[in-house]
């Protein structure tokens, strides 16, 4: 399993220290990243989770895959204005992050990773 569950502290070290710069996110990673915002009680999140895990294994070493539980990390969810779950945030090495709301299938997730991150 190549997915890492993020806390606020880990987010500030691996993704961005958003408390330093409120205007924009200065990405700290050495590889593009994708974050799945979810909740354990969310049916669509539970359906999407195995897809996310499979794709994370396929892109191991190329893209960092993270998960954030919105109930445990409300501040991180607010940072990306997460209003529905699952919400998937794609963070490329250069350029602005992109957000996709709702569960997507494996082909769509792989296409998004290839087009947005690689």
Which ranges hold each PLM region?
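Structural signal for short hydrophobic segments within the conserved structured cores
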Residues: 4, 66, 97-100
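A short beta-strand-turn-helix
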Residues: 6-33
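Short pre-active-site segment immediately N-terminal to redox-active cysteine/selenocysteine motifs
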Residues: 30-33, 37-41, 84
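Conserved redox-active cysteine motifs that mediate thiol-disulfide chemistry
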Residues: 37-51
């Amino acid at each position: 399993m190549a997915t890492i569950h993020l806390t606020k502290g880990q987010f500030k070290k691996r993704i961005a220290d958003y408390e330093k710069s409120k205007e924009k996110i200065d990405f700290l990673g050495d590889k593009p990243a994708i974050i799945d915002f979810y909740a354990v009680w969310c049916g669509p999140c539970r359906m999407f989770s195995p897809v996310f895990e499979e794709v994370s294994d396929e892109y191991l070493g190329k893209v960092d895959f993270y998960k954030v539980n919105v109930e445990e990390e409300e501040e991180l969810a607010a940072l990306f204005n997460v209003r529905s779950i699952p919400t998937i945030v794609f963070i490329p090495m250069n350029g602005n992050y992109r957000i996709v709301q709702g569960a997507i299938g494996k082909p769509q997730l792989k296409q998004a990773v290839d087009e947005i991150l690689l």
